[in-house]
From Swiss-Prot:
Pfam families: C2 (PF00168), SMP_LBD (PF17047). Residues 127-305 form the SMP-LTD domain. Anchored to the endoplasmic reticulum membrane by a transmembrane hairpin structure; both N-terminus and C-terminus are cytoplasmic. The C2 domains mediate lipid and calcium binding. The N-terminal C2 domain binds calcium ions and is important for calcium-dependent lipid binding and interaction with membranes. Two calcium ions are bound at a high-affinity site and a third calcium ion is bound with lower affinity. May bind up to four calcium ions. In contrast, the second C2 domain apparently does not bind calcium. The third C2 domain mediates interaction with membranes enriched in phosphatidylinositol 4,5-bisphosphate and is required for translocation to the cell membrane in response to increased cytosolic calcium levels. Belongs to the extended synaptotagmin family. This is Extended synaptotagmin-1. Residues 1-38, 599-630, 911-930 are annotated as: Disordered. One of its GO terms (biological process) is intermembrane lipid transfer. It comes from Rattus norvegicus. Interacts with ESYT2 and ESYT3. Interacts with ADGRD1; inhibiting the G-protein-coupled receptor activity of ADGRD1. Interaction with ADGRD1 is abolished when cytosolic calcium increases, relieving ADGRD1 G-protein-coupled receptor activity. Interacts (phosphorylated form) with SLC2A4. The chain crosses the membrane at residues 31-51, 55-75. One of its GO terms (cellular component) is endoplasmic reticulum membrane. Keywords: Acetylation, Calcium, Cell membrane, Endoplasmic reticulum, Lipid transport, Lipid-binding, Membrane, Metal-binding, Phosphoprotein, Repeat, Transmembrane, Transmembrane helix, Transport.
């Protein structure tokens, strides 16, 4: 702001100011007071004043007449005084702001203790330039803008309000005046932009207006309004893109970088909003509404040319970058806690608030510490550079009100220029310093350096969230042909987008099945190779799903510039329902020359830390990896198949022992310190259990499997025999399938099959193992394990102290599913050494996780970790051996390794070696005349029959089935996997299920039915059915599979969508491959 000598000239040397002269003219011009009103006017004024004071006493009288206590009167008085205090404060602020804007030059000179003539002409502010010419234009335009606002509110807004609610049919604007005080542009700053097609402007906007807007609802005699308002903030204006045609600028974007300050002076019924409590609540709600469309990252876009390209990206552009903020520590903080009425000075319980724009993070509280160590990491999106700031505020946690300890601010532009900043920053408004490491992560449009980023992130001990490797921006545009609600009503669609446990929602679009959203959503990705984007299109009630989409983010890694811009077909929706989205992924990359992080395991200056005072021994170096003993990871899994028994002793007697009955046998197993038990088979001397148990065993010699058979009785169970099997033979041979003669009884034998499953450090065979387990799974057994997890917990460091000074007595709890292992307790130390191992059976490695809690005796949880096992599947040798950061303070050194459970007699080796030549027959181990085990058969047929046929799908769709015969159990097994491309009759999608009959019987004994799937043409069932039949009886039957749908809610009629009939004599039941079968109409005679 430059001032010329003419502008700095003082006022005319007159004893009176122009304002005084004009006042005198209004009062009569001579300084003599005007003639007073008559006696009647004076009496009326006195009566009015008396009436107002009398009116104040009316609430007091009413409270006394109603029998209310004096507390209600005092409460009302307190509310009134609070309202008056807020009201007077707003009016004073409004008057001061108006006075400042009316006489800015004089007040500025007085503040500098100079007269107008003494203010030098060379005083200027090079960053911000005055724009008085713009203010003069606004002054001239302001009355016409007021006329436009009056027409807009009266002709557009008022009718909309009256139509929205029947109670507001008498709503009107009784007064609309923008006043004489227009918006002022205090200064303009033009930023040099790195892009040639963009101009950045910052406008310092100040509005201290005397506007008055009054509304009235005549039906309820309700009046309300606004009389005066203040708004101050920095408005950024972006002119982009610059084009070669008029008007040169393609669009204008406007937004506030920070939330502006707002102060409203209410009138009428809205005076109630000035009551303390309501005042802050109403101001916050209004500011939230403004921020929802005009505060970064939201912006107002005004296109200036038609058919502008990339409007969605202009409205929500890609971030400029990501800043990874490492909040490490603070030192020299002031003490705020006092004891014994301030006589004893304590410490503080500090925590930090980190803000960048609207993104806010809160650290954990460190109790009683003036030099806290947080060691926390946050990732923030930077939308605009320059302009945004990193702000850190430190507080002392108190039960009532937290005490302020200091703050620091830093422009994000400095981080962009430096790449990495690692400094101690002084706290303003307090004492002490805060230690921050700030890293600028660039956004790369290709996946070339993704592996390098993932490898680096694995070494970062980040809390409370793991470090991100990429960012995903989803531009949700529109949808087409969504299904209608019941009664052919238009839905109110909205969209839920989820990546792992982070879910964001779009706004709802009302009464349309072709909604347009035009919204942007941003997600941080830890590993885009394994994560998915889940999209659910729902009605605004969230109860009705209109469509769904699951998109593996690995698809973007192979797309051009990591971008997909296309229509996506919705599942569980209409046949033509689709969603248009633009997905943009960017890899977060830190320059390799700066990849050095103090919080990396092993990278801290542990060796440079001096030992305790008085010690002459150097501190031992911190280990990088664990050192487990030689027995760790050598466990195997023993799978025990308890099949059947024969010729058991009859123990039941009736009529005092005169009538001999049978027995109710069950089997009890004891092995490796565990006790297992089958179910009871009622009244059978030749029972079939067909149950499977799994036990983790070691190779220690001398172990035995104790088997006992009992008859279940009401009082005491009767003994039916026992047998002991040495585990050394089974562990060496890997397989045992024998009839065991029971000992200590006259008769009886038990059929037992034992398998040793050796864990393998490769995930190549996992999918095959999971599918084989699903096929050999019995109904009476728990789900079979697919992997073995071995954990070695060595030590922990830097655990939090009790009450800030006393070390805890920590122990750890390892949990997977419902299985837990508790370590020993190490007394009074923040660096315990456990050196303990534990093993867990894993049934679904993709879905399960390892939970670790470090607890202290009497102090609760000190820290925790949740490690998804899916991360191990991506590691070489399926193993992680490093330091892991706890969610609280501290770290643990741990080795976690996974082994896939593959039977040595399952035929996997034969397939893996012969897969290169499909013509080669798999090698059969052992005696060629010996019947192959069912597991071998299953594995062999999976390798050749699992892929679906590529033939054309029939007009009624297809059903996927697996049919095979289990020779050992003498059961026919059928698995209904799924259907695809089913027929749709009418506008509503079917609710399909599958009904299975074993012809020629049509009774309930052979009928099976799957669960029902809602509103889909591609249902997934994966349900298994069994029939106890001999092989010869099975070959004389046909399997009738019908896909049906409920025709309506009130009707019991079932609509046939298609069927297929399989002659079991024409199928190779030993192969049992999963195959797709064409559905036919009931009138057709064909097969599949």
């Amino acid at each position: 702001m430059e001032r010329s000598p003419e502008e700095g000239a003082g006022p005319e040397p007159s004893g009176q100011s122009p304002a005084t002269d004009s006042t005198r003219e209004r009062d009569g011009g001579s300084g003599v007071p005007p003639a007073g009103p008559g006696a009647a006017s004076e009496a009326l004024a006195v009566l009015t004043s008396f009436g107002r004071r009398l009116l104040v006493l009316v609430p007091v009288y009413l409270a006394g007449a109603a029998g209310l206590s004096v507390g209600f009167v005092l409460f009302g008085l307190a509310l009134y005084l609070g309202w008056r205090r807020v009201r007077d404060g707003k009016e004073r602020s409004l008057r001061a702001a108006r006075q400042l804007l009316d006489d800015e030059e004089r007040i500025t000179a007085e503040t500098l203790y100079m007269s107008h003539r003494e203010l030098p002409a060379w005083v200027s502010f090079p960053d911000v330039e005055k724009a008085e010419w713009l203010n003069k234009i606004v002054v001239q335009v302001w009355p016409f803008l007021g006329q436009y606002m009056e027409k807009l509110l009266a002709e557009t807004v008022a009718p909309a309000v009256r139509g929205a609610n029947p109670h507001l049919q008498t709503f009107t604007f009784t007064r609309v005046e923008l006043g004489e005080k227009p918006v002022r542009i205090i200064g303009v700053k033009v930023h040099p932009s790195q892009r040639k097609d963009q101009i950045l402007l910052d406008l310092n906007v100040s509005y201290v207006g005397d506007l008055q807007i009054d509304v009235e609802v005549k039906k309820y005699f309700c009046k309300a309004g606004v009389k005066g308002m203040q708004l101050h903030g920095v408005l950024r204006v972006i002119l982009e893109p610059l084009i070669g045609d008029l008007p040169i600028v393609g669009a204008v974007s406007m937004f506030f970088i920070k939330r502006p300050t707002l102060d409203i002076n209410w009138t009428g019924m809205t005076n109630l909003l000035d009551i303390p409590g309501l005042s802050s609540l109403s101001d916050t709600m209004i500011m939230d509404s403004i921020a929802a469309f005009l505060v970064l990252p939201n912006r107002l876009l005004v296109p200036l040319v038609p058919d502008l390209q990339d409007v969605a990206q202009l409205r929500s552009p890609l971030p400029r970058g990501i800043i990874r903020i490492h909040l490490l520590a603070a030192r020299g903080l002031s003490s705020k806690d006092k004891y014994v009425k301030g006589l004893i000075e304590g410490k503080s319980d500090p925590y930090a608030l980190v803000r960048v724009g609207t993104q806010t993070f809160c650290s954990r509280v460190i109790d009683e510490e003036l030099n806290p160590h947080w060691g926390e990491t946050y990732e923030v999106i930077v939308h605009e550079v320059p302009g945004q700031e990193i702000e850190v505020e430190v507080f002392d946690k108190d039960p009532d009100k937290d005490d302020f300890l200091g703050r620091m601010k830093l422009d994000v532009g400095k981080v962009l220029q430096a790449g990495v900043l690692d400094n101690w920053y002084p706290l303003q408004g307090g004492q002490g310093q805060v230690h921050l490491r700030l890293e600028w992560l660039s956004l790369l449009p290709d996946a070339e350096k993704l592996d390098q980023v993932l490898q680096w992130n694995r070494g970062i001990t980040s809390r409370p969230e793991p470090p991100s490797a990429a960012i995903l921006v989803v531009y949700l545009d529109r949808a087409q042909d969504l299904p209608l609600k019941k009664g052919n009503k238009e839905p109110n669609p909205m969209v839920q987008l989820s990546v792992q446990d982070v879910t964001q929602e779009s706004k709802a679009t009302y009464s349309t099945n072709c909604p347009v959203w035009e919204e942007a959503f941003r997600f941080f990705l830890q590993d885009p190779r394994s994560q998915e984007l889940d999209v659910q299109v729902k009605d605004d009630s969230r109860a009705l799903t209109l469509g769904a989409l699951t998109l593996p983010l690995a698809r973007l890694l192979t797309a051009s510039e990591l971008t997909l811009d296309q229509w996506f077909q919705l599942s569980s929706s209409g046949p033509n329902s689709r969603l248009y989205m633009k997905l943009v992924m960017r890899i977060l990359y830190l320059d390799s020359s700066e990849m050095r992080l103090p919080t990396e395991p092993g990278a801290q200056d542990w060796d440079s830390e001096s030992p305790e005072t008085g010690s002459s021994v150097d501190a031992p170096p911190r280990p990088y990896h664990t050192t487990p003993n030689s027995h760790f990871g050598t466990e195997n899994v023993l799978r025990i198949h308890v099949l059947e028994a024969q010729d058991l002793i009859a123990k039941d007697r009736f009529l005092g022992g005169l009538v001999k009955g049978k027995s109710d046998p069950y089997v009890k197993l004891k092995v490796a310190g565990r006790s297992l038990r089958t179910h009871v088979v009622r009244e059978d001397l030749n029972p079939r259990w067909n149950e499977v148990f799994e036990v983790i065993v070691t190779s220690i010699p001398g172990q035995e499997l104790d088997i006992e058979v009992f008859d279940k009785d009401l009082d005491k169970d009767d003994f039916l025999g026992r047998y002991k099997v040495g585990l050394t033979t089974v562990l060496n041979s890997g397989f045992l399938d024998e009839w065991l003669t029971l000992e200590d009884v006259p008769s009886g034998r038990l059929h037992l099959r034992l398998e040793r499953l050796s864990p393998r450090p490769t995930a190549a065979e996992l999918e095959e193992v999971l599918q084989v387990n699903s096929l050999i799974q019995t109904q009476k057994s728990s789900e079979l394990a697919a992997a073995l997890l071995s954990v070695y917990l060595e030590r922990s460091e830097d655990l939090p102290l009790r009450k800030g000074t006393k070390p805890p007595s920590p122990y750890a709890i390892l949990t997977v599913g419902e299985t837990s292992h508790k370590t020993k307790t190490v007394s009074q130390t923040s660096a315990p050494i456990w050196e303990e191992s534990a093993s867990f059976l894993i049934r679904k490695p993709h879905a399960e996780s390892l939970e670790l809690q470090v607890r202290g005796e009497g102090t609760g949880t000190l820290g925790s970790i949740s490690l998804p096992l899916s991360e191990l599947l991506q590691e070489e040798q399926l193993c992680l051996d490093r330091w892991f950061a706890l969610s609280g303070q501290g770290q643990v050194l741990m080795r976690v390794q996974l082994g896939i459970l593959v039977s040595q007699h399952s035929g996997v080796e034969a397939h893996s070696h012969s897969s290169s030549s499909l013509n080669e027959e798999p090698e059969v181990l052992g005696d060629p005349t010996h019947t192959a085990s069912p597991v071998l058969e299953v594995r062999h047929r999976l390798t050749h029959g699992d892929s679906p046929s590529e033939a054309l799908i029939g007009p009624l769709g297809q059903v996927k089935l697996t049919v095979w015969y289990h020779s050992d159990e003498q059961k026919l097994i059928s698995i209904i996997h799924s259907c695809r491309a089913l027929r749709q009759n009418g506008r509503d999608l079917p609710d399909p299920y599958v009904s299975v009959l074993l012809l020629p019987d049509k009774n309930r004994g052979t009928k099976r039915k799957t669960s029902q799937k809602k509103r889909t043409l591609n249902p997934e069932f994966n349900e298994r059915f069994e029939w106890d039949l001999p092989l010869d009886g099975t070959l004389r039957r046909k399997l009738d599979v019908s896909v049906k749908s409920n025709s309506s809610f009130m009707s019991r009629e079932r609509e046939l969508l298609g069927k297929v009939q399989l002659d079991l004599a024409e199928i190779d039941l030993s192969q049992g491959a999963a195959q797709w079968y064409d559905l036919i109409d009931d009138r057709d005679k064909g097969g599949s």
